[in-house]
């Protein structure tokens, strides 16, 4: 019985480590993709000579929140990204790709 418990806890710890590694990988991917999208939106905002305040007025997103995610201090939701893109006459497109 004790051997089964040791095996159970050993397998449980291994699963938890695999899950933690997987979660970290996914979080890193999401952060990188979000950063790329935000950079594209900010570049487009500059190209259109729009200020954060103008984006805020159109979208209702507080300028402080815009500043936070433009600087990488916060990861915006997909809804916030779409609002921002829409204010620039653009939209967000999501694709499913192979690894």
Functional labels for PLM-detected ranges:
Residues 59-75:
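Recognition helix of helix-turn-helix/homeodomain-like DNA-binding domains
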Residues 79-94:
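DNA major-groove recognition helix of helix-turn-helix/homeodomain DNA-binding modules
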Residues 2-6, 10, 39-56, 83:
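Short basic helix-loop element that most often maps to the first helix and adjoining turn
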Residues 36, 76-79:
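Charged, alpha-helix-enriched surfaces in structured cytosolic catalytic cores
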Residues 1-40:
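N-terminal flexible/basic segments that precede or flank functional cores
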Residues 95-99:
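Short, charged recognition helix plus adjacent turn
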């Amino acid at each position: 019985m004790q051997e089964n418990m040791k095996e159970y806890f050993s397998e449980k710890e291994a699963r938890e480590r695999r899950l933690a590694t997987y979660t970290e990988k996914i979080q890193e991917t999401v952060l990188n993709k979000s950063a790329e999208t935000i950079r594209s939106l900010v570049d487009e905002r500059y190209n259109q000579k729009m200020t954060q305040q103008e984006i805020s007025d159109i979208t209702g997103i507080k300028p402080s929140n815009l500043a936070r995610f433009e600087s990488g201090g916060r990861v915006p939701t997909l809804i916030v990204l779409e609002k921002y893109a829409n204010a620039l006459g653009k939209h967000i497109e999501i694709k499913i790709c192979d690894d």
